[in-house]
Amino acid sequence: MVIANKNIIFVAGLGGIGFDTSREIVKSGPKNLVILDRIENPAAIAELKALNPKVIVTFYPYDVTVPVAETTKLLKIIFDKLKTVDLLINGAGILDDYQIERTIAVNFTGTVNTTTAIMSFWDKRKGGPGGVIANICSVTGFNAIYQVPVYSASKAAALSFTNSLAKLAPITGVTAYSINPGITKTTLVHKFNSWLDVEPRVAELLLEHPTQTTLQCAQNFVKAIEANQNGAIWKLDLGRLEAIEWTKHWDSHI
């Protein structure tokens, strides 16, 4: 996908990886970048607008844990304004295994619900034009950080959901791929809680190993967007972009 002149919705586009990715997207010259985030950050929005004045950057407050009907109402406002949307990026995520229900609600259910809502506008069975979804998952969806099993499981669920979306593309007209960052230097990983305090130093221990910057991750994210490969499972780790081959151990045969 050539980003230039496209209309993009970015859920959580002001977060750690999200904001640097928003910067890289704006540099590539989309027509519209619509950022949906829980907390408004006027300074960040102003920075994005200044980075490329030709790009229309707009912000709407959005909590991914709201019901599908609420998300659909918000998306209708956006679609009525833009007429078409080319790409949805689902990027909301939290890392805190003390908050079990919220971790699942944000990292998994929120991705499912936002995707379900946009299908009302994109699904070709309803006369829609189709579209592209990029879901930010995690390398923990491949192999868990076992000290944060709730977070890891939520990301594995989001990855599985994305893989299914890709296979449904011939039916819906909506393609999908996953973005799976490795350990990236964000506020998310500086301090977080392990499940039942099984490892109080989990954040410190993780950061003792090689990491990547948010800029490195963002630059590779944009490369994945440009590749636009339905069903791709992208690993963004240590400053590199790599397509992962999923190992099949079972098949439903349907």
Swiss-Prot record:
The active site is at Y151 (proton acceptor). It comes from the Eukaryota. GO terms for molecular function: alcohol dehydrogenase (NAD+) activity. Disulfide bonds: none annotated. The keyword Cytoplasm does not apply. It comes from Drosophila mayaguana. SUPFAM superfamilies: NAD(P)-binding Rossmann-fold domains. PANTHER family: 15-HYDROXYPROSTAGLANDIN DEHYDROGENASE [NAD(+)], ALCOHOL DEHYDROGENASE-RELATED. Substrate binds at S138. GO terms for biological process: alcohol metabolic process. Homodimer. NAD(+) binds at residues 10-33. Its EC number is 1.1.1.1. It is an enzyme of class 1 (oxidoreductase). Belongs to the short-chain dehydrogenases/reductases (SDR) family. It catalyses: a primary alcohol + NAD(+) = an aldehyde + NADH + H(+); a secondary alcohol + NAD(+) = a ketone + NADH + H(+). This is Alcohol dehydrogenase. InterPro entries: ADH_Drosophila-type, NAD(P)-bd_dom_sf, Sc_DH/Rdtase_CS, SDR_fam.
